[in-house]
């Protein structure tokens, strides 16, 4: 019972870190990156579909992304979706593919993106702590119902705290890495 609760909590914490990693990867760093476009969707036959599924995305240069739709009729929709996104880029359509020049970030924009990265990291840490709280409640329930002894539950709580600290540290490292990428000129 205790092992199950700890395993479940660790699995959920792992997912929270993965979500944080994905969230942080969508923050633009001033370098071209195909992941920048993972959250942009277009209406494709009535379904919101990510453009990463509708086109090949290549990075031939550090500040240039080339998007080649699998279907030529999606060119205009993809261009519009990118232009309307919060990426702050201006795509150019040459009739066969879309070129996106990634502009240099201003100092002010870098600071803004660092704040955004820290905020996403904090949200992920709150998520991990909520998972810990729920697991602690489960451990207290197990103790109360007599399914495990006081010592066993105490050890499990220490293990849970250690695991929580480990995942919070991972999130801090992700944010620190992203901050370094953003502030690098």
Swiss-Prot record:
Alphabetic keyword roster: Cytoplasm, Protein biosynthesis
Record's keyword annotation contains Cytoplasm: yes
Gene3D superfamilies assigned to the protein according to its UniProt record, in alphabetical order: 3.30.1360.40, Ribosome-recycling factor
Job description of the protein: Responsible for the release of ribosomes from messenger RNA at the termination of protein biosynthesis. May increase the efficiency of translation by recycling ribosomes from one round of translation to another.
Keyword Cytoplasm set for record: yes
Any one of the GO BP annotations: translation
Stretches the record annotates as Disordered: 144-164
Molecular functions (GO terms): ribosomal large subunit binding; translation termination factor activity
Gene it is expressed from: frr
Subcellular location, principal: cytoplasm
InterPro entries named among the record's database cross-references: Ribosome_recyc_fac, Ribosome_recyc_fac_dom, RRF_sf
Organism field: Mycobacterium tuberculosis (strain ATCC 25618 / H37Rv)
SUPFAM superfamilies (alphabetical): Ribosome recycling factor, RRF
Record-stated family: Belongs to the RRF family.
Name of protein: Ribosome-recycling factor
Superkingdom as given in the UniProt entry: Bacteria
UniProt-listed Pfam families: RRF
Compartments where located: Cytoplasm
Assigned GO CC terms: cytoplasm; peptidoglycan-based cell wall; plasma membrane
